[in-house]
Each structure stands twice: as C-alpha cells, then as structure tokens.
Amino acid sequence: MAVQRTFSIIKPDAVAKNVIGKITTRFEEAGLKIVASKIKQLSKAEAEGFYAEHSARGFFGDLVAFMTSGPVVVQVLEGENAIALNRELMGATNPKEAAPGTIRADFAESIDANAVHGSDSEAAAAREIAYFFAATEVTTR
C-alpha cells in the first residue's frame, strides 16, 4: 500500500455540535496524520467553486447555503490508503445508511447535514487540497 493524502471537511453541522475533536480523534486513531488544518468560514464564491461539478444539479443552491451557514474545518490527512480509509471512517453519504460506528452514523443528522466530506479519488484529493491549501501549508510528519 502507498502513503496517500486526502482532503477532509468537517462541515458546519458537526462544527456547531462541537465534535471537531471527536472526529479528528477518529482519523488519528485509524492511523491518519493531519498534515494541514484550518478552520474557516466559506464565502459563497468559495463554496460554489469547490462544488462547481454539482452546479447543474437541483441541490446545488441548498448545498452552497449549507456549506456557508457556519465555519468548517478543512484538513489534509495522510496515511496508508488514506482515501479509502477516510471514506470507510465517514460511512455512507446518507447517515441512515451508514454503518454503526462511522462518523456519519454517530454525528450526522441527514443526507444534507452529513458532518464530513472526503475526497473520492486521488485526482479529487489533489484538486481539493490545492483549492484550500498552498503547497507550503501542507507539512510532512
């Protein structure tokens, strides 16, 4: 297995519930290292740009409104098979379908307010990391 980097967002619903530390602990206990992290309030333009691939879909406006409704935590996670591992930790997009013990099963309310985002491929991870972090902001641990 190769060491990979993946991108993670702890979304406004989870930040509002004050579970940033609990979610971060899940990443670290699974062997992922946090190599970049910042908390920020997304602007409408940032959210629209990040989710541009969904711009033609009916839920786009609601997604942008949700992602700008409060602060988020954007992170770069690093570890063996990081992309697949993070997706396993997150659980299914719909928390009602997420396996018990996953982040979404434990902390998410709905398919819209589903606590976390994670890259789904190496190409997406590279694009998403670069969207929020300069290369100089990502460390090696």
UniProtKB/Swiss-Prot annotation:
Cofactor(s) needed for function: Mg(2+)
Alphabetical list of CDD domains matching this protein: NDPk_I
Positions that bind ATP: K11, F59, R87, T93, R104, N114
UniProt keyword list: ATP-binding, Cytoplasm, Kinase, Magnesium, Metal-binding, Nucleotide metabolism, Nucleotide-binding, Phosphoprotein, Transferase
GO MF, one annotated term: ATP binding
A single GO cellular-component term on record: cytoplasm
Organism superkingdom: Bacteria
SMART domains: NDK
GO biological process, one term: GTP biosynthetic process
EC number: 2.7.4.6
InterPro entries: NDK-like_dom (IPR034907), NDK-like_dom_sf (IPR036850), Nucleoside_diP_kinase (IPR001564), Nucleoside_diP_kinase_AS (IPR023005)
Residues at the catalytic site: H117
Subcellular location: Cytoplasm
Keyword Magnesium: yes
Reaction equations catalysed: a 2'-deoxyribonucleoside 5'-diphosphate + ATP = a 2'-deoxyribonucleoside 5'-triphosphate + ADP; a ribonucleoside 5'-diphosphate + ATP = a ribonucleoside 5'-triphosphate + ADP
Main subcellular localisation: cytoplasm
Assembly notes: Homotetramer.
Function per UniProt: Major role in the synthesis of nucleoside triphosphates other than ATP. The ATP gamma phosphate is transferred to the NDP beta phosphate via a ping-pong mechanism, using a phosphorylated active-site intermediate.
Family membership: Belongs to the NDK family.
Family annotation (HAMAP family): NDP_kinase
Protein name: Nucleoside diphosphate kinase
Protein source organism: Pseudomonas entomophila (strain L48)
